[in-house]
């Protein structure tokens, strides 16, 4: 038996390989066993739905002429000139005849389906006059889609017959030698369906209706074969019949089609060529919450969707998709044995007709940053508003002050968060010969409690076109990355996306970053490689997590101690800290003028009065003798230029700002100009020159890449394709402000021999002296295990004076010099 649409050689051909006119979709008709076949195991339906006729039976229905060769493929009813579907088929046929030259026939042959734009159907005047398409497609989707499929089937059949006749005429063949065209079943997949249905409106009243919904894929099942037609052989006479299985529900024939036979028992013949199986997959889609749909205290709704044939593998967890399909019901799976009355309980699901993956579509190499805003639709009103915003004189100041207007001051911190919103451009995303370089900056805000870190974080996640906000103390590792769950019905393992995967091509805000415990290791790969690898239960895979991580943390002890480094204040590893492009340190310094203005601002916000004129709140640095590149004064600092001017400030609403950010991320892909590159290179080389000490902070190419990313984001903020010299200078000022917090000690002095990751300035020499003494003792005693009392004795002998000896040992433990092996027992790691 020939497989697929082939009965000889080539696509959709039959009748032997020696046919000189063999072409696509041509072949001999089905003549029984052993002849060129026209059914398919992998296609939706087959042209013959009964067993080969026996000689003693008369098939009178085949003698009637049917103008539509594929009628039996689409309709179970016999053809009639009075059929109510004929008018619809003719209207669709007229529409497809106009479009036939636009369709790729090879693509239709490969997929077995054709994509039809719903808006083009509505714009066709002849079709609109013949069929009330919008109401009929919604209320009778199966019949309308079958009419559409039969129409394209007929148009393609006639087109190929015309093509075959032309070839026959050129070669001078006789009419009886011409091959017969057989086109298989073709699915009509309607996309761009304009009326989106929210998941909360997906109720029993929509059963059998055609709907479109948009959401995020949170779970993808395995691909399985689904039997749509099964061949059954009669146990009494041996006759074979093909029995349809609607919706994949197994049913057995009730009687034999042979009139003389009264058999009632049948055997399924799974290996028969009449048995048709298709690829089948289930996905779980979670709703997207817009501003007017946010409901406090409710978990996001989900719905199951079934994909068949060419729709399988069209999405992965984390993708944002639009599914159009028919609402159907299935029996409830859980609790079926506990309660007999559960037979009346059903679950709604979507039988997908088309899937539009708005995130999985990759652009050209110049758009390697991905379609960050691809899921956003822009109306003409939106585009005019974006044009109006872009024409503002001081756009950077407008966006920075619109980000979180309730928080007073901190303009440079808001500037860094604004740049993270827009992001840089990812390089080599589609080049399989090179490793991609991330374009999303990561930002950490550390500071005393009560300075508005969490509010700024929530504002960023709210403005982002795709933002996920999580709290560190209630987050697990699998909740951040990927959860491996078992399906209750099939027992198969499936992937459920966590916060980082759901925030792909967006923002992931993590509050209480210092209270995450052991979950920090889960972020290392996601922050640099921008993917999450999983190896569990025999499943090895990698999921994309191209997200900017914005984190807020409180220092240990409740107050930031400038005598310690960032690593010591947060008790966090250097591997994680080095991945942040900007680290902002907010210190609550008492100051009479600032406190007075801040209190006035809070009272004005609470009372609804006109906002006071803001002044820039900057860190008060004492005079110091160190001269460095971080302290070179500019004509007018960026912080001064970003502060609000005038008595009244009109901030952009978040909904409009979200549209602007989405437009910039989708359509603007800037590159560095030579002047900007020179400024960044000079600043980087100066930093390297000032950090040549043995114990100095490692200024690596990560800092240079951070500068490039932020400069691209600065140009993207103003919708420019080139980053200018001024962009680079402003980014350098933001980077200086960030580095000031890292390098300044408890006296306000700049000390370039301290880093984010090492010890505090006062403890460094003591730590080196103490560790070298431990090395000597361990070499003499051949034992690298020390009890706490022994460590205290060694420190006393060396006359090392520290305020808190336990904190001193804890610092050595954090830096990897000592490893805690048990209660008050430490192992030396440097020998």
Swiss-Prot record:
One of its GO terms (biological process) is DNA damage response. The lineage of its organism: Eukaryota, Metazoa, Chordata, Craniata, Vertebrata. Residues 1-53 are annotated as: Disordered. Residues 1-20 have a biased composition (Gly residues). Belongs to the MCM family. Component of the MCM8-MCM9 complex, a complex involved in homologous recombination repair following DNA interstrand cross-links and plays a key role during gametogenesis. The MCM8-MCM9 complex probably acts as a hexameric helicase required to process aberrant forks into homologous recombination substrates and to orchestrate homologous recombination with resection, fork stabilization and fork restart. In eggs, required for elongation during DNA replication by facilitating the recruitment of rpa2/rpa34 and stimulating the processivity of DNA polymerases at replication foci. It comes from Xenopus laevis. The keyword Ribosomal protein does not apply. The gene is mcm8. It holds the Pfam family MCM. This is DNA helicase MCM8.
């Amino acid at each position: 038996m020939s497989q697929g649409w082939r009965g000889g050689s080539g696509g959709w051909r039959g009748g032997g390989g020696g046919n000189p006119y063999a072409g696509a979709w041509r072949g001999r008709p089905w003549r029984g066993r052993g002849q060129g076949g026209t059914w398919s195991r992998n296609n939706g339906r087959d042209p013959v739905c009964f067993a080969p006729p026996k000689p003693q039976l008369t098939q009178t229905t085949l003698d009637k002429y049917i103008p539509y060769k594929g009628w039996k493929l689409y309709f179970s009813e016999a053809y009639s000139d009075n059929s109510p579907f004929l008018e619809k088929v003719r209207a669709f046929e007229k529409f497809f005849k106009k479009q036939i030259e636009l369709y790729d026939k090879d693509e239709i042959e490969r997929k077995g389906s054709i994509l039809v734009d719903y808006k083009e159907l509505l714009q066709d005047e002849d079709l609109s006059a013949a069929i009330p398409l919008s109401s009929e497609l919604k209320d009778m989707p199966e019949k309308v889609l079958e009419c559409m499929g039969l129409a394209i089937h007929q148009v393609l059949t006639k087109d190929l017959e015309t093509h075959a006749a032309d070839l026959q005429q050129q070669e001078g063949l006789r009419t009886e030698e011409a091959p017969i065209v057989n086109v298989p079943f073709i699915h009509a997949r309607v996309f761009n369906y304009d009326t989106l249905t929210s998941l909360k409106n997906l109720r029993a009243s929509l059963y059998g209706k055609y709907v479109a919904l948009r959401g995020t894929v949170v779970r993808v099942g395995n691909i399985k074969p689904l039997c749509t037609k099964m061949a059954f052989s009669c146990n009494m006479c041996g006759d074979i019949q093909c029995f349809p299985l609607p919706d994949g529900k197994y049913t057995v024939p009730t009687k034999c089609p042979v009139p003389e036979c009264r058999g009632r028992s049948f055997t399924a013949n799974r290996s028969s060529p009449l048995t048709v199986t298709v690829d089948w997959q289930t996905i779980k889609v979670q709703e997207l919450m817009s501003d007017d749909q946010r409901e406090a205290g409710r978990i996001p709704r989900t719905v199951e969707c079934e994909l068949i044939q060419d729709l399988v593998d069209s999405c992965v967890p984390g993708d944002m998709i639009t599914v159009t399909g028919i609402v159907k019901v299935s029996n409830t799976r859980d609790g079926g044995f506990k309660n007999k009355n559960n037979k009346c309980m059903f679950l709604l699901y979507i039988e997908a007709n088309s899937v539009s993956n708005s995130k999985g579509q990759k652009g050209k190499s110049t758009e390697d940053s991905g379609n960050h805003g691809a899921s956003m639709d822009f109306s003409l009103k939106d585009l005019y508003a974006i044009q109006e915003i872009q024409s503002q004189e001081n756009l950077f100041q407008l966006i920075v002050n619109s980000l979180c207007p309730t928080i007073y001051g901190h303009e440079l911190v808001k500037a860094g968060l604004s740049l993270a919103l827009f992001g840089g451009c990812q390089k080599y995303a589609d080049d399989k010969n090179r490793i991609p370089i991330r374009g999303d900056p990561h930002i950490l805000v550390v500071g005393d409690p009560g300075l508005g870190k969490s509010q700024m974080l929530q504002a960023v996640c709210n403005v982002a076109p795709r933002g996920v906000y999580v709290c560190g103390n209630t987050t697990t590792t699998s909740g951040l990355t990927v959860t491996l769950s078992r399906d209750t019905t099939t027992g198969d393992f499936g992937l459920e996306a966590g916060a980082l995967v759901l925030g792909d091509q967006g923002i992931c805000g993590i509050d209480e970053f210092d209270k995450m415990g052991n979950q920090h290791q889960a972020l290392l790969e996601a922050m640099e490689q921008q993917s999450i690898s999983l190896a569990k239960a025999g499943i090895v895979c990698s999921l994309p997590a191209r997200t900017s991580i914005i984190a807020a943390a409180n220092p240990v002890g409740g107050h930031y101690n400038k005598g310690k480094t960032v690593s010591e204040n947060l008790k966090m590893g250097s591997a994680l800290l080095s991945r942040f492009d900007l680290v902002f340190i907010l210190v609550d310094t008492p100051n009479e003028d600032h406190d007075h203005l801040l209190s006035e601002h809070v009272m004005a916000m609470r009372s609804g009065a006109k906002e006071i004129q803001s002044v820039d709140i900057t860190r008060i640095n004492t005079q110091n003798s160190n001269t460095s590149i971080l302290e070179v004064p500019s004509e007018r600092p960026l912080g001064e230029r970003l502060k609000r001017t005038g008595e009244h400030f009109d901030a952009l609403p978040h909904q409009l700002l979200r549209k602007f950010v989405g437009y910039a991320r989708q359509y603007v892909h800037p590159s560095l100009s030579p002047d900007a590159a020179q400024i960044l290179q000079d600043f980087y080389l100066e930093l390297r020159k000032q950090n040549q000490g043995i114990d100095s902070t490692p200024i690596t190419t990560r800092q240079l890449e951070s500068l490039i990313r932020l400069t691209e984001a600065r140009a993207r903020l103003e919708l420019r394709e080139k980053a200018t010299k001024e962009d680079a200078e402003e980014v350098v000022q933001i980077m200086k402000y960030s580095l000031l917090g890292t390098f300044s000690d408890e006296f306000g002095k700049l000390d370039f021999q301290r880093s984010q990751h090492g010890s505090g300035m006062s403890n460094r020499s003591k730590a080196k002296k103490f560790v070298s003494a431990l090395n000597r003792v361990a070499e003499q005693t051949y034992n690298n295990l020390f009890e706490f009392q022994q460590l205290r004795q060694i420190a006393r002998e060396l006359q090392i004076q520290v305020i808190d000896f336990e904190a001193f040992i804890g610092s050595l433990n954090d830096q990897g010099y000592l490893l805690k092996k048990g209660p008050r027992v430490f192992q030396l790691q440097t020998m």
